[in-house]
């Protein structure tokens, strides 16, 4: 089985190493910077390099993971889908709704599987939280609390290309609210500040944001996201219902403690290592002709999470007025 990693930066390298561990297959590395593709190919078993997606398709490819920069996603996904290659694209498919929908409908028209990398769907803790919530173990859900805080922000030049903290980071949380409850978000009230990284204000972005959401059954949610949490990567969720509360995530993982403990998680790659590997395994199974995993992120998940993130942007830049996605 020939599998391509298109985009050989940090997240592409992470996926390549998961693919290595899951083998056997032939890995092809593709990147706009040939040296980066060569370096990753040398680090992984049974890997070669293709100069472009066009060359990759001409040589033959059974599945592809798009892990390039956000602005490159639409063009790469379009080329792969039109060539009939099952594709897993890191979120988001695009940073605007029309292109997201266009890519999704293109995949449906061609009958090509298109997954979006919402790896939290494959995290055992989040999956268990969803199963218990949807099964009614908590009774009527009243409130959700979600936290997503990075250790440190990416370079500003990269952030210029990836959208705001709402569409880049909190996008996961909007997706999780929908996925955990099976409900739709109908109102968003958001706010933000550039506290630790004031330079983000120059590009119309924030490093610390909050969002309050209302679902279509009047359940409420409180979301927070941030670019700066030096004590460790902090992602967790709590669902509060009539019969009790359930939570996922190391709520005490980032407490400094008396001795100033080391961070438990350095970033998404170790916090969600199990989830990423499970997602890749499920994707390869599907691409090889097996069943599609119901946990897989879809283009509609990406579209609807982006719709909420853009509503949060509008709210935060308009004096925190309520916005309907």
UniProtKB/Swiss-Prot annotation:
GO biological process: any one? antibiotic biosynthetic process
Write down the chemical reaction(s) this protein catalyses: myo-inositol + NAD(+) = myo-inosose-5 + NADH + H(+)
The scientific name of the source species is Streptomyces leeuwenhoekii
Q: In which pathway does it act?
A: Antibiotic biosynthesis
Question: Which gene is annotated as encoding this protein in its UniProt record?
Answer: hyg17
Q: List the disulfide bonds.
A: none
Q: Indicate the enzyme's highest-level EC class.
A: oxidoreductase
Q: Does the keyword NAD apply?
A: yes
Q: Which keywords accompany this UniProt record?
A: Antibiotic biosynthesis, NAD, Oxidoreductase
Q: What does this protein do?
A: Dehydrogenase involved in the biosynthesis of the aminocyclitol moiety of hygromycin A, a broad-spectrum antibiotic. Catalyzes the NAD(+)-dependent oxidation of myo-inositol to myo-inosose-5 (neo-inosose). Shows reduced activity with scyllo-inositol, minimal activity with L-chiro-inositol and no activity with D-glucose, D-chiro-inositol, epi-inositol, muco-inositol and allo-inositol. Is specific for NAD(+) and cannot use NADP(+).
Q: Name one GO molecular function term.
A: nucleotide binding
Description of pH dependence: Optimum pH is 10.5-11.
Please identify the protein, giving its name as recorded: Myo-inositol dehydrogenase Hyg17
Instruction: Kindly give the SUPFAM superfamilies that the UniProt entry links to this protein.
Output: Glyceraldehyde-3-phosphate dehydrogenase-like, C-terminal domain (SSF55347), NAD(P)-binding Rossmann-fold domains (SSF51735)
Coiled coil regions, renumbered to chain? none
Similarity section: Belongs to the Gfo/Idh/MocA family.
Enzyme Commission no: 1.1.1.-
């Amino acid at each position: 089985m020939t599998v391509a990693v298109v985009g050989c930066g940090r997240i592409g390298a992470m996926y390549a190493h998961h693919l290595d561990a899951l083998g056997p297959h032939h890995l092809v590395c593709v990147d706009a910077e040939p040296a980066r593709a060569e370096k990753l190919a040398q680090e992984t078993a049974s890997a070669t390099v293709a100069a472009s997606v066009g060359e990759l398709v001409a040589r033959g490819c059974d599945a592809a993971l798009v892990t390039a920069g956000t602005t490159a996603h639409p063009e790469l996904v379009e080329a792969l889908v039109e060539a009939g290659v099952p594709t897993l694209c890191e979120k988001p498919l695009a940073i605007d709704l029309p292109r997201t929908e266009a890519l999704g409908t293109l995949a449906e028209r061609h009958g090509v599987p298109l997954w979006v990398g919402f790896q939290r769907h494959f995290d055992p803790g989040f999956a268990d939280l969803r199963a218990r919530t949807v099964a009614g173990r908590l009774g009527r859900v009243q409130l959700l609390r979600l936290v997503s805080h990075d250790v440190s922000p990416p370079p500003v030049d990269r952030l210029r290309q990836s959208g705001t903290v709402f569409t880049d980071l909190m996008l996961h949380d909007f997706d999780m609210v929908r996925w955990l409850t099976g409900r739709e978000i109908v109102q968003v009230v958001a706010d933000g500040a550039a506290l630790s990284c004031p330079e983000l204000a120059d590009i119309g972005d924030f490093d610390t944001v909050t969002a309050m959401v209302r679902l279509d059954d009047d359940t409420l949610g409180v979301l927070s996201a941030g670019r700066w949490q030096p004590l460790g990567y902090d992602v967790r969720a709590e669902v509060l219902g009539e019969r009790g509360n359930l939570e996922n995530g190391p709520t005490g993982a980032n407490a400094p403690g008396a001795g100033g403990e080391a961070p438990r998680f350095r970033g998404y790659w170790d916090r969600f290592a199990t989830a990423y590997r499970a997602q890749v395994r499920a994707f390869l199974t599907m691409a090889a002709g097996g069943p599609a995993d119901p946990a897989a992120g879809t283009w509609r998940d990406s579209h609807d999470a982006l719709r909420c993130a853009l509503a949060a942007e509008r709210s935060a830049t308009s004096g925190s007025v309520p916005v309907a996605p």
